[in-house]
Regions:
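Short, solvent-exposed coil/turn elements at secondary-structure transition points
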Residues: 71, 120-122
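Short hydrophobic/aromatic-enriched beta-strand-loop microsegments
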Residues: 110-118
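Basic, amphipathic alpha-helical segments enriched in Lys/Arg and hydrophobic/aromatic residues
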Residues: 101, 105, 110-111, 130-194
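Short, surface-exposed amphipathic charged segments that create phosphate/polyanion-binding patches used
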Residues: 10-14, 127-135
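Polybasic low-complexity intrinsically disordered regions
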Residues: 1-109
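Short secondary-structure boundary segments
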Residues: 96, 118-119, 146
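Structured core elements
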Residues: 55-57, 67, 93, 115, ...
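Short, charged, surface-exposed secondary-structure boundary motifs
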Residues: 79, 102, 123-130
């Protein structure tokens, strides 16, 4: 997951109380933008961001991007996680945001090794073994963080160029395609066994 800011200035929270929404619940204090109705607020590392999140699934050996998805920033990372799994992987490496018991069980049922970092909670601290496991998984996850660094630093995805989720999703897919083409050009040719 990586937060991407929209091309417009984020709206400020409203000063007046608002009536309940159509579902009867109180409206969010952080309103949506009138110019970009698909963008939403999120909080990451103590900072608030308004915009979108990019999610990618890559091949561990070649660093080829296999799946990608753009969501609004309010979507939890666990929601699009299953869409990033192609199904033919031997193992899935992911950070703590993707850790769910159902996901681990689903991966095992599909004969995929779940290498998801363990998440501590207020009732149970991580054991030393789980901490070592998280360190090992963190080292294997480095290629996906490099993809995000390239998307933001070289391709300018730190800020969304377009208004709307669909246009930004298309832009993300085109950038991933460009990155894959550049990556394929430097990969060694696959050995053919007869």
């Amino acid at each position: 997951m990586n937060a991407i800011q929209p091309p417009v200035k984020p709206p400020s929270p409203p000063k007046d109380p608002q009536p309940p929404g159509p579902d009867g619940r109180a409206p969010s204090k952080l309103v949506n933008s009138e110019r970009d109705p698909d963008a939403r607020w999120t909080k990451k590392g103590g900072k608030r961001y308004f915009g979108y999140k990019a999610h990618v699934g890559i091949d561990q050996g070649s660093a080829i991007i296999r799946r990608n998805k753009m969501t609004d920033a309010s979507v939890n990372d666990t929601v699009p996680a299953d869409e990033l799994i192609s199904g033919d992987e031997k193992a899935v490496y992911a950070d703590q945001a993707y850790d769910k018991h159902e996901r681990r069980a689903g991966l095992v049922a599909r004969s995929i090794k779940p290498r998801l970092m363990f998440r501590p909670n207020k009732h149970h601290a991580l054991t030393e073994r789980q901490k070592r496991f998280n360190d090992a998984v963190g080292r294997r996850r480095a290629p996906v963080e490099q993809v995000f660094a390239r998307l933001k630093g070289i391709y300018g995805m730190a800020r969304a160029r377009y208004l709307g989720l669909a246009r930004n999703q298309t832009h993300l897919r085109l950038l991933c395609l460009a990155m894959n083409i550049k990556r394929w050009a430097v990969l060694p040719p696959a050995e053919v066994t007869a």
